[in-house]
Structure formats: structure tokens, C-alpha cells
Amino acid sequence: MMERLKIAYPVITEGKYDKIKLESLIEAHILCTDGFGIFKDTEKQAFLRRLCDKTKIIVLTDADGAGLVIRNFINSILPKERLIHLYIPQCAGKEKRKTTPAAEGFLGVEGLPPDLLRSLFAPFADNGPKNG
């Protein structure tokens, strides 16, 4: 198994399965929006604002409409200059744990190949290859 990438910035992702997948690939403080739950969770919103005062935050959501809505909401409540947006490609398929594909037919963060996710985080890793 490859060494997990050490990421200094906290990471926001959508759900617990995304978090589990990321934890297998990176060492970072990983937070979940609980899907659309972030919209009404004022405590979590306040926590994210306080966190943004101290550090930049990486945002990684699914490549579907719901992921875009969540990403835009995060953009609206946090200072844009403190956010690092990572984007996954729209890959057709279904996650192994699901019986049917998602509504839009794309894999979410949890369903993507590990190498693809590692390549997204590599530029921010303390122990990995740097791009640029």
C-alpha cells in the first residue's frame, strides 16, 4: 500500500463514504458537509468560518449537480481567497456499495480510482511529488 499523502490543509467533502475513501489516501483533517445538511447546520458553518481564519481549506465535492450546489454554498459562506477548489472529472459509473448509479450517472469521490484522487492532492502534499 502506498504511503498516505500528508496534507496540511483541512479538506471538506460531501459524505462519510467520501471521507473514508480520502482517509485511505491522505493524512488530513477531513470534514463532511453531510450532503445538503451543511445548509442548516449553523454550528458547522461557524466552525468552518473559524477554521478559515486560521488556514486555507481544500474543497472536494462530487462532479454532479448536488456537488456543485454544495460547493457554491461553501463559496457563499467562506472567504473565497481561503478556499482551494479541487475538481474531480465526470466519470460514468456506479459506486461498488450501490445497486444503481447516482441520478446523473457519475462516480462520486468515493468511487474514483485512488491514483486519480492522489494526483489531485499531490501538489499540496508535504511528502509527495509537487506539480508546477
Each language-model region and where it sits:
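Short beta-strand scaffold positions
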Residues: 13-14, 61
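Hydrophobic/aromatic beta-strand patches that form the interior of the parallel beta-sheet core
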Residues: 12, 31, 84-87
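Short, glycine/polar-rich helix-capping loops at beta-to-alpha or helix-loop-helix junctions
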Residues: 16-21, 44
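TOPRIM fold recognition
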Residues: 5, 24, 38-132
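A short beta-strand-loop structural module common to alpha/beta enzyme folds
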Residues: 28-40
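A short, flexible N-terminal coil/short beta segment enriched in small residues
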Residues: 1-13
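The start of beta-strands in P-loop NTPase/AAA+ ATPase cores
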Residues: 9, 29, 56-57
